[in-house]
Amino acid sequence: MMFCVQCEQTIRTPAGNGCAYAQGMCGKTAETSDLQDVLIYALQDLSAWVLAAREHGVIDNEIDAFVPKAFFATLTNVNFDSARIVAYVNQALAHRQQLVDRLAALAVQVTGLPEATGFEPGDELLAQLAHASQTAVNRGKSEVHEDIMGLRLLCLYGLKGAAAYMEHARVLGQQDSEVAAEFHRIMSWLSTDPSELDSLFKCAMEIGLLNFRVMEMLDLGETTAFGHPEPTQVRVTPVPGKCILVSGHDMVDLKLILEQTAGTGIHVYTHGEMLPALAYPFFKQYPHLVGNYGSAWQNQQKEFANFPGAVVMTSNCIIDPNVGDYSDRIFTRSIVGWPGVTHLEGDDFSAVVAKALSLDGFKHTELEHFITIGFARNALMQAAPAVIEKVKAGEISHFFLVGGCDGDKAERAYFTEFAKAAPKDSLLLTLGCGKYKFNKLDFGNIGGIPRLLDVGQCNDAYSAIQLALALSEAFECGVNDLPLTLVLSWFEQKAIVILLTLLALGVKDIRTGPTAPAFLTPALLKVLEEQFGLKGTTTAEADLAEILAA
């Protein structure tokens, strides 16, 4: 009874939206999809018990870490392995029992729990699947208005994005008890199937503000561990030698791989959202970190097939490795999973090293090509005075933030066209894997300031927000009064929560595309346009004309 509507590539038909057959458009089977719904339900139950325990002074950091991590496994293109999802469900049930036992030992009578608590799906795959109808994310759809269902899903998917960033922050040593409590509160509340429009809209904004705090934690974790990114020239063509490709967002894994490949003759390349790592001072101590290979996630079946070495997926996004016949040399980490692919636990990457040494590696040097990255928060703040002077002098007319998630729809050419057509006296900021639509093009500079400023990973929207705040302070105006336009490409749940963060902070007149999320009804989209000025993209030419005429 699969139903999944969380990503941009979901099925859209006149009869309704969402993947609801044997397999989703992402390659996720109905079995895995249903098990993920069971997992979400179990995690919401666990969150309710976490809140009850907190009321009596019982705080468990391990459980606070587990819930968002396991929730992360249900994001688009993260974990396709049913057995791993079953194991997460069982862990959730075990953690719940720990809390029940601890409260019983305190002779505490727990009351006021949501009806969903006490969920008992069993510990085996078939038993858990039997609960699919009870746990479906669109349960009760025939009894509630489609706008209510759309807002429930907006909150659920936004919270998934926040959970992913919480896990990224945790890996870097950043946990916050108040953030965890707010996360559990929203998880538990969503399990009650709320049906009041205003409360759901309020929750969506609360998720956005929660995520702002999480992005701040993640920024602190990355800069504490690796220093502040700095403008850096990065090679994007390979050199001869054995090789490992590291994709995803987890820079701690990249660090471990670099340590364990030192002196082996293996070259390490970043891929996708790992590209920004090359701008951090810490990683410049490793001469065998030679550059970035490939582009965004949707091209991996071709790029990984052509890569003559081992591949490590540290987080999203993974797609079917059997298509390119490289499943025997790709490895998954943390929450990532694909059936039949080797999953690595712990910090030992010797299997990856051995695989890389057994493969041919690159035989020839390709023509050098470099791009510039590293314009995250600190670099932007250092450049801000010069930028402000050029705005005052009339040399810079507008700022565009063009980025987000990439994808394979032809309509995404819009973002390439938009960047190329932007006025020559404008600056282009970009982040996320959406940057690959244009980050190898030469946009020139304005008085020594590159017109294209790569801010970093999708979560580095935090850096862009800090720049906007600095500019608004310098020009003594609100952020919405700046000559600044945000044009965001969305694909999955991280992009959803970043959008919620921007809206919760009061940022207006954002354009997003190439299509609207399928779970948002026309009425909800109208409300978002009326309240926030949120618009869908049309054509690059028409949108630019409208923006510049305002």
Swiss-Prot record:
Its main location: cytoplasm. [2Fe-2S] cluster binds at residues 4, 7, 19, 26. Hybrid [4Fe-2O-2S] cluster binds at residues 249, 273, 317, 405, 433, 458, 492, 494. Transmembrane segments: none annotated. Its cofactor is [2Fe-2S] cluster; hybrid [4Fe-2O-2S] cluster. It is found in: Cytoplasm. Binds 1 [2Fe-2S] cluster. It catalyses: A + NH4(+) + H2O = hydroxylamine + AH2 + H(+). It holds the Pfam family Prismane. Keywords: 2Fe-2S, Cytoplasm, Iron, Iron-sulfur, Metal-binding, Oxidoreductase. One of its GO terms (biological process) is response to hydrogen peroxide. Its EC number is 1.7.99.1. GO terms for cellular component: cytoplasm. Catalyzes the reduction of hydroxylamine to form NH(3) and H(2)O. Belongs to the HCP family. PANTHER family: HYDROXYLAMINE REDUCTASE (PTHR30109:SF0). This is Hydroxylamine reductase. It comes from Aeromonas salmonicida (strain A449).
